[in-house]
Structure formats: structure tokens, C-alpha cells
């Protein structure tokens, strides 16, 4: 293994070796964080409390993860089920905000990181730890999201980011694991880096890194490939109240269960695969493959319902608010006052986002085919092309003359000046 880089001093919250006695490590049970657990003990001579947080990511056995950390020397190992908090305080607001970074990415990782950091802070205080450690790289967004949250909520705590300190590639990590008796799962040998929770899944690295490459089929493990999806379409009715989904096909359920059910429906129909290039906070342009079946289904339905119940001005303003909300979330600024201000507006606007939306799923497509709401502003008697429409068409010419006044004047005056 290469020597550890000298501890950086670019920020006051970064831990120096003499300051570290007990560390809360955000632990997944995978190769990276298992190596970190041993590495922190060796390099910092510190105790480690392993914290594994369930945000709905698929896993074989959380108890096995808890025990693995203890076997590797953790003084305590905690598994916390945070799915309800995740959907209530993070995913729910994201649904109301139609949250998609740069118009595409539904922000599932970005939504989870502030919660992980918040719970790590709580665990550090409960276990008398002085430092929090995470497995994020120095090239990614997650280091920003986690560390910004930690220093905001707990300025007394220090942070360790082992991946920024050590000089190990994947092969060196595997060698370190073998040398230190760390069990290696078969998934650790896969060429892709994975991250997932209840709201979505990402794959990056390997052949994915080059945007000129066509990604092989084996990357997608959550969503059925569209070509292999059923040959018949499937309709699902999503009921919203106060801007949040509350029922599928008339069956009411809590948001965790609803997201899980929506994911099943969308995934089996090939809905929710995204091949995405985006701009990271740190300045890099990167490519990821996202599998977001529930998010694609729910966000598409929610946006269409808003279009039905909002005025034109509300729709324009909401689009701007949503884009700013997504940007702040992506950047990890969960405690930025502006986000609270945006949430207040969104909550007020969402009071009328109520009704049913029917989405038709077919071989990768999710199309809204019907929508209804007691607050809908669509009036068939006005909009119809039939002769008995109640819309006062004869009033239109006067409106057009006034509506176009300044545009007409500007064009005509400027044309006259140019013609002189």
C-alpha cells in the first residue's frame, strides 16, 4: 500500500491525527468502507463506531453488515432504519418540487446524503465521538454534501475522508482487504461503482465513464430493459393530496410502501433508465446510468397534475422555483435559508395539487393519459371547439390589439429608424 498523504490543513474541520480518538464511520458493509474501518484503526489509532443507515437500498442482510463491522474491530455497530424519515423529510419535498437536477436527474443520492450526515452527527454525540468519517472521493459531490452538513450542524466535530488521504486504487483496496482478513463479496469485483436507495440507483465507472461508449446491458439490475418488458401496456392511477402521492389504483398506503409499489410497476415495464451527463459541484462533467422507476412515474404524474390546477403564472414561477430547489439540493446546501423559503412557497402552492393521474407504462415509456382534480382549471365548456362553446370569441380582437401593443410599437418604431 502507498504511504498516506499528509493530513490536509485546507479547512479547520479536517481531523489531524492527534485530534482523533473515536470515529463514527458511515458504513455500508462494502469493500471501501470495510477497508476504511481497519485503516482508521491502524492509521489514526482510533476507535470506530460503524453506522449503517437503511434508506431503502436493497441488501441481503443488515444484521450481517452490523456483525461484519464488529468482526473488523468496531467498538460499536449500529444499523438504523431511516426510510420513513427519508421519504417524509427529503423525498416528499422533492416530489412537491418536481426535483430533477438539470431537468433530468431525480436527485436520489443528493437527497440521502444530508440525512446520512445528520444521523452521523447524532450518533457521534450519542457515542462521545469527536470525528465523522465517510467513503466519498475527492472528485465527487457527496463529499460536499456530507461535510457541509456536518460542519453546519456540529462545528465541534472533525471529519476524515480516507479516500482523499490514501493512494489506493481498486486493486490495492482488494489487496489490502486480503492482507487484513476483510471478507470480499463478489460484487466488489464488479467494474461499476453503485449507489442506491428507495428513490433510485446509480452506476458509474468502468465503460460508463466514456460518454462515447454504448453501455452494456448488464449495467441495469433494477429496471427491466425496455426491449424485454411486457408487450402489453399497464396503466396505474396515482392519487395526490397536498402535492404528495397517497394512493395507487385507489389503494391508500404510506409513502414508503407507495414508492416501493410504484418502483415495481415502472421497473417491470422498463420505465426509469437514464443515461445522463451532468455537471458536478466540483466542476467535473460526468456520466452516470440512473435507474429511477418510482421517481420517473411519480414525478411525471405530479408535474402533469400541477399543470392542470395551477394558473399560467403559477406554472411559470413554479418551474423557476423547482430549478432553484434542485440546484440547492444537488449542491448539498440543505440548511441554506433559501431552501426553506422555497419550501414555504412550494407547500403553499401544493395545497391545491390534489387529484388522480393515470400513467400508461409501456416498454420504457411512461405517458400521462388522464388527469382529474377538484381544483382543475380546465373548463370543457370554454375550451371545446364545438359551436356551443361559452367562450366569448368576439372579445378576442380587442384583447389582441392591447396585448400586442408594446411589441407592435417596438417593432414598427425600430423598423422606421433603420429605414431612414
Predicted regions and their residues:
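Nucleotide-activated chemistry modules centered on ATP-dependent adenylation/adenylyltransferase
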Residues: 2-26, 31-420
